[in-house]
Regions:
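Single conserved hydrophobic/aromatic residue that forms the stacking wall/gate
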Residues: 183-194
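Glycine-biased, small-residue-rich flexible motifs in mid-sequence functional cores and linkers
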Residues: 1-185
Length: 194
């Protein structure tokens, strides 16, 4: 049941722990973004996840506050499959307020981690988690991220892994949109040959 696309990456995990049914029989798309998201960003993530789920995609995210939570909720609202990739052991729910969300995800999809039981969430775990989020997906959609946000790390991994990378442009006066705006600006430069 190991995610086949993840095996194609340059640094796949040696193993995965999971809760629920990890039997994803459909293409996966990651929806990631800022923990300090705006209401607009949460609504966009929820809507994208709902619509993509209805089209048959499995939604993958990191179950963090903000955009990740909204993406999982959108998939669940549509009756779709969703996978949460944790930056801690399966026995630890992080953030704690997502306990019910974690249970719901495990009942219809899966909660997975490469970290052993007892491993707490810390800053160095999240970039490791992000390579799994992008690695098991065909595409990554970033909805709100500052320039140095973890979602931009996921975007970088997506590029290195040959995955399609998309960003939702946001308001130019929002710090939470700066990373997406930078990405869309760079992509536009590439299209213009700049």
């Amino acid at each position: 049941n190991f995610p086949s696309m993840l095996l194609e990456t340059f640094d796949p995990p040696t193993g995965l722990y999971w809760e629920g049914e990890y039997n994803v029989d459909r293409p996966c798309i990651a929806i990631v973004g800022s923990r300090r998201s705006t209401l607009y960003g949460q609504n966009v993530a929820r809507k994208f996840a709902t619509e993509l789920s209805r089209l048959g995609f499995c939604i993958v995210s990191g179950m963090a506050r903000g955009i990740d939570t909204a993406a999982h909720q959108g998939a669940l609202t549509a009756g779709g499959k969703t996978v949460a990739v944790l930056g801690c052991g399966l026995d630890i729910v992080y953030p704690p307020e997502n306990l019910e969300l974690s249970k719901h995800i495990a009942s219809v999809g899966a909660v997975i981690s490469e970290f052993p039981f007892g491993r707490r969430a810390d800053r160095q775990n999240f970039p490791m988690r992000n390579r799994i989020v992008s690695g098991m997906c065909e595409a990554v959609v970033v909805v709100e991220s500052n320039v140095a946000g973890g979602s931009m790390i996921t975007a970088r991994f997506a590029g290195e892994q040959g995955r399609l990378m998309m960003a939702v442009p946001g308001r130019i006066d929002q710090v939470s949109s700066a990373g997406c705006l930078l990405y869309t600006s760079d992509a536009a430069d590439d299209l213009r040959g700049g």
